[in-house]
């Protein structure tokens, strides 16, 4: 049985060589067309980068640390303090 499967595999390789080449070439052509359609020019990328930078929040100094951070960032809480708060509320 194994011998017949090996022979069938060899015959399928020789018989489907033309078919597989056609399939692979078609796949490559479709991928190349998609890559060309999806490309974006450098000018468009610069324009998008400029739009994104205008939407960012201003940076303000943190009152505790003095380091600058975005204005919209909420204050962080220590995990140990958060655990203590949650455990006290359950009792």
Curated annotation (Swiss-Prot):
One of the GO biological process terms: response to salt stress
The keyword Nucleus is assigned to this record: yes
Keyword annotations: Cytoplasm, Nucleus, Stress response
Cellular compartment(s): Cytoplasm; Nucleus
Region (Disordered): 47-72
Induction: By salinity and drought stresses.
Entries under Pfam families matching the protein: LEA_3a
GO CC annotations, alphabetized: cytosol; nucleus
Top-rank lineage group of the source organism: Eukaryota
UniProt similarity note: Belongs to the LEA type 3 family.
Protein name: Late embryogenis abundant protein 2
Source organism of the structure: Arabidopsis thaliana
Gene for this chain: LEA2
